[in-house]
Amino acid sequence: SIMRNDITIHPHERVDDLHRDGHLIIQDPKRFCFGVDAVILSGFAKVKKGENVLDLGTGTGIIPILLAAKTEGKHFTGLEIQTESAEMANRSVLLNELEERVSIKEGYQGSGAAVRGILV
């Protein structure tokens, strides 16, 4: 696969292959990196065609990216309170050209807004 050249990869970051249809993820080895638990968790999530998914504490965005790669869910939202992690996850979404199906939001949902779909 060809990596987009309009996505910034900082010197302290690395790009890892998710071994799923050429999908990649940006990670900072000095910060949190996803583990096998995230991959296993994404395997347990049964997402049906047309469903929306919310991943709380998305970190690197690994779960929404994996679920978008392997399911027919409509939209995947990753919610992350750490600015740096949210920004890095957003770049991973762009790197994989998944912005139509995956969005990363920084902050927390304190508004009590209703969520329809699957909560991961």
Provide a role label for each language-model segment.
Residues N5-K48:
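Class I SAM-dependent transferase core
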Residues G43-V120:
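Conserved SAM/SAH cofactor-binding pocket of Class I
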Residues S1-I2:
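Short, Lys/Arg-enriched N-terminal segments with co-localized hydrophobic residues
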